[in-house]
Amino acid sequence: RPSYSDYLIRILTASVYDVAVETPLEQARSLSGRLKNNILLKREDLQPVFSFKIRGAYNKMAKLPKESLARGVIAASAGNHAQGVALSAQRLGCRAVIVMPETSPQIKIDAVKNRGAEVVLKGVSYNDAYDHAMELAAKDNLTYIAPFDDPDVIAGQGTVGMEIVRQRADKIN
């Protein structure tokens, strides 16, 4: 497990801006007024896939060896991570297989397909989809892209924090 300083270095050197944009940090005026506190929102809904998940997926995939990208990647997700992996694969020119639960909303399935990924529907839960993704990864020699709990995914997603620090010179609680 990387140390905190290792993660900081990984965040500072993350490759996310080929697909992600630096999003604004905006005050939520109404919410701030109601709570009598300054509430800021990091507008990750402005990302190409409307979520911060693109950051982790792309950072992980951009760091894969060329041979791994040539074989392709696989992920299990019902939504935002799936779209992040699909867009990352599209940009990196590799095959992406996304295993989604059969209960996934059609709008999410279509969004993943529109990014060029192959969608496999399996089971009724994330765990069912994950188990099947791991089977396919082993069978087809695909690299599994975790939605979390991977140092490169964490570092990519951690760029949100780096931007917040850069965007706010004053103390943030």
What label would you give each PLM region?
Residues 1-173:
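PLP-dependent amino-acid enzyme catalytic core
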